[in-house]
Amino acid sequence: HSKYKLNMEPNLKEGVGGFRDANLVFWIGKILFNVDNIKNLPSSIIDEKEYKAFRIALEFLFRVRSALHLVSKKKEDQLRLDLIPSVAMLLKYENSQNGHMRFAKKVTGSLKTIRLYSTIWIDALTKDYHTEDTTGKNYIYPRKDTKNFNDILIQLRVHADESFYAHPTYLQQLISIKKPERLNKTLYRTIRTLLYKPHCYSIFRALSYAKLLRYTIPPIKQVVDLPQFDGYHQYAVDIHSLNCLYHLEHIEDNFILTLWEGLSNDEKAMLKLVVFLHDV
């Protein structure tokens, strides 16, 4: 996906969470289990509730692609900014800035849903064929003694002394673990400590991949998947905010790095929070 990132002009076929990802799940399942539908894969791999969310997202993206072909009068897979108004209108969205934003927001959210479940399912389908990881991504894996969401956050915090990625099995645990309907005092205290880690970005990225960013950081809720039609921003607000946090933790300019290192731990944590929420 390095060529087609999840930006403001996503490629519905080749990009993140696109049809290639969904088709890969289907074909691996077809070869291994001789099924004609992802839904018919073993329940140990495909949870019914997860499949429903996946299918709703996929059906919506199929409709978007059909409308995109009609508007562009060719087999166009990239949802360019100039095509969004016409495509949105074909799909019965209000012909207004708000209508276009609602449409683009749903596209981004749907692509993230496909990315999440295809990542988890492809790993589950191919686990018997895995070889030693040589990607250098420093994956973290689920722990058997994890009982609740607070335990998950603590594990993320422990690993955030260096950059890491959440393994697909960890993403599965993230979305499946028991969570209170609303954050409680214990969770708020733990979330606060995440900002003090040198690689807080890795934590927030894992939560974003699991579509739990809005749950864990409530102020970001209104801007998750929100498009920015200003000609300057390349990504939805939450992805842009994550990128900002990444660059704050990976300062390359020596003078700015000196200023950063001169801050106290409390000041660094506060600045991370301000940077992450600057567009809220």
Where would I find each of the regions flagged by the language model?
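His-Asp-centered metal-binding catalytic motifs of divalent-metal-dependent phosphohydrolases/nucleases
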Residues: 22, 64, 207, 244, ...
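Non-catalytic interface/linker regions that flank or bridge core catalytic/transmembrane domains
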Residues: 1-233
